[in-house]
Amino acid sequence: MSTWSSMLADLRKQAEIAKQQAKKGIDVTKNGLQYGVSQVKLQALAAGKSIQKYGNKLVLVIPKDYDVNTGNGFFDLAKAAEELGIQVKYIDRNDLEIAHKSLGVTDQFLGLTERGLTLFAPQLDKFLQQHSKISNVVGSSTGDTVNKLAKSQAIISGVQSVLGSVLAGINLNEAIISGGSELELAKAGVDLASELVGNIAKGTATIEAFSEQIQNFGKLVQNAKGLGGVGQQLQHISGSALSKTGLGLDIISSLLSGVTASFTLADKNASTSTKVAAGFELSNQVIGGITKAVSSYILAQRLAAGLSTTGPAAALIASSISLAISPLSFLRVADNFNRSKDIREFAERFKKLGYEGDKLLSDFYHEAGTIDASITTISTALSAIAAGTAAASAGALVGAPITLLVTGITGLISGILEFSKQPMLEHVASKLGTKIEEWERKYGKNYFENGYDARHKAFLEDSLSLLSSFNKQYETERAVLITQQRWDEYIGELAGVTGKGDKISSGKAYVDYFEEGKLLAKKPDDFNRVILDPKKGKIDISNSQTSTLLKFVTPLLTPGTESRKRTQTGKYEYVTKLDVNGINQWEVNGVKEKGAVYDFTNLIQHVHISSSVARGEEYREVRLVSRLGKGNDKVFLASGSAEIHAGDGHDVVYYDKTDTGLLMVDGTQATKQGDYTVTRELSGATQILREVVKNQKSSVGSRQETVEYRDNELAQSGNSNLKAKDNLYSVEEIIGSNHRDEFKGSKFRDIFHGADGDDLLNGNDGDDILYGDKGNDELRGDNGNDQLYGGEGNDKLFGGNGNNYLSGGDGDDELQVLGNGFNVLRGGKGNDKLYGGAGSDFLDGGEGDDYLAGGEGNDFYVYRSTSGNHTIYDQGKSSDSDTLYLSDLTFDRLLVEKVDNNLVFKPSDHNSNRGSLTIKDWFKTGHGYNHKLEQIVDKNGRKLTSDNLETHFNGTPKTNLLGYTAENQNESNLSSLKTELGKIISSAGNFGLAKQGNNNHSAALNNDVDKLISSASSFATAQMGGSGIGLLPSNNANSTILSGLARTA
């Protein structure tokens, strides 16, 4: 290993030792400074013992002819010295002058004489006059003597503490007697102590210089290897950001007048000569007079140890200093200023909206950044000095005491600065608090509430397009929109920084009116209280005279009042606890005369209380009680329990707009139509909107503030037993959730929608209307004339007794009716199975390969060219008269075949993609059943009877084209068909169709029949006023007519 490498390794080791010793010095200093004035005497005595161990006590020297009652309060200083056990010596001025000359003591208040360490009263008086801030602390010789005495003791004991660190390891008695290098070393230490005290008093004189220096840092380190990123960040700091005075930096000294040189040392690519030059510059400029004193002290130490003081030694010191400088500490400084800049840009908008709190927060980070930058940079420079001292003392027998000496000094300064930092930051925070209080006195309003007001104004500006669309979306003339301005990070942080967490609320609710998509002008403050009272939990829109939407645009916190208490939980820790006096009910009075829409989906009804492994998440529930008016209302419920008094009109309750849990709707105990009990399971993965207590943390230096607030979150309930229970009164229609719901109807008419999920709907008695919607649903009409709509999915529909209408919709459905009523069964898309009852049924398989069984009674089947491969199995009585209607086909284009016992119809065009129609067991006899269809009618009114087909197959037909076998076109066939079909449809659904007049044109009669068929598909819309689910229309106009030959019967 080269000599230079070995030297660097040794330097790194020495630097690390110096850092550890510096840390110890800081810790010792912190422990000493935290006691306050009451411990001043103990500190002074301890420091005196440290000095006395190696030399005489500290002596306050006062000329005999010096008037202690003049000047800046030396009467108090003399008394303080006596109280602290410091000797006060009055000597002739001539003796004092001789002592100065013989010992080379300059015109400073600290010195070395034959008596030992000496405080020179005149020089100290002059010093205090020059530094008014220190002088003001001491005060005059009149006034509060006890208080001034304590302050005087603080000054003197502080000087003793400094001297105790500086002179540790030096025997002053021997140094004074022997003179020489030891005496020079001691004098250098005293000089250093004087500079330390002096610099602390210099105030803000060089803050602007510091502003320029930190800019130079960025320029220098931007090009230094390994420090480019730091340099770029520092360049973002505005030069003017650090140039302001009056920021609470009164005790920051001018330690940084030449700190630029330290970054030159950090450039590992710089030449040795450059580092040497930078090292000398650092020695003379980095921290002003202190660095010069440290340099003198290092040189004196090296002379005392017989070590070299040449250029290479200086380079060695400079190299060690470079290792001690950590630019990473400046990243936090840059982050503070960048955060201030970001907040300031954000604040500009809200300042225009009447709130300046964001600017105040930006000011805090700006000023805190200045303080932090100053102290960080000073500490970095002091670390470099400690490392340089360690390098200078390397190899010396007195190295360890000397290193301890300097690290003690730097530790002392760092401790003073660190303990000064907190009061400075608190001073800045206090100024912000004062501004807030002044604003509140002027405007008579809570400052943070004003911040929420500004946030809401911005929300309206940003969301106007969305808010304006609600009138049209919900089809109402007026929209009453309630918006919760939730907890705001910046507003909360300002409350924490200023210690006013007990003055802030978790947010604020607002009410806005929109008509015809336009925002109405704001009314006075009492407007909100009329519509919404969040403290009492009351909402009232009963005065609205038009159709109205009540919508909670954002989640609304539960009703009640908040209170907060700020408590100190540690030396620098404060917690502002939140207490909520909650109301367990929302009460809503709706529009009296007009229809309205009530969207409660963003109403928070669950307050999170606690969590445990055994019981899961626990909640307090807030129940919704709503009293509506006479109009047709729509109510969208949230996840909590509700009591809905719907009033007159056709009212609908929706559970599908948010996750309301699995439903069990029960109307079996109802004594009035529209009364239901709804039980909801909110366990497992059910997502509920819940209110939780969160906390925001902010810091002011060492002070940590935690403020609790209410917020909302959408989360799994986490409670396997959590339920909600609704009581619905006078509700005509219920829309289910997106879970597997169960509906049990009443003895009255029920209208249920399963919505998403595999639902079970049972209408029980009454003329019910059931919709499965999406999912594989099961619908049971039971007794009564029911309408069942499967919707999407593979559904099962059971009509029960009565005249029923069943529509499978999409999917592979199964439809079945009982009894001898008139029933309509429509399969829709998919491969369906349709089973009629003992009465007259209409069976339309729709698209797909369907199976149709009419059962007993006079049944009516429909087949189209788009129907796929259908199978009809009619197991009726011999007296039955069943009909097959070929909606868009003619006999001329069909072939008929006997396949086993089945009658099969196929397109005459063998290449056609159309399906076939099989009438199962047509030719089967016995068992007492009739499997034939008595008549088959095509789109033009031509008819085939079962006898015609019997004759056809018993003879020797020239062709299987049915056109040769069917009767001639006859309009009376279509007229009769229309009558039969109309009877079934009108009985099953009571469609209220107008009677069709006679029409001699067969095409018109065909259209009338198709109108009867297609009218079924529009029944839901006609009956439900648009709220139902329509049927698939009949497809009767798009088939391709196949050519064929027709034979006259």
Swiss-Prot record:
The chain crosses the membrane at residues 246-266, 311-331, 375-395, 397-417. It comes from the Bacteria. It is found in: Secreted; Host cell membrane. One of its GO terms (biological process) is killing of cells of another organism. It is a multi-pass membrane protein. GO terms for molecular function: calcium ion binding; channel activity; toxin activity. One of its GO terms (cellular component) is membrane. The transmembrane domains are believed to be involved in pore formation in target cells. The Gly-rich region is probably involved in calcium binding, which is required for target cell-binding and cytolytic activity. NCBIfam families: RTX_toxin. This is Exotoxin PaxA. It comes from Pasteurella aerogenes. The gene is paxA.
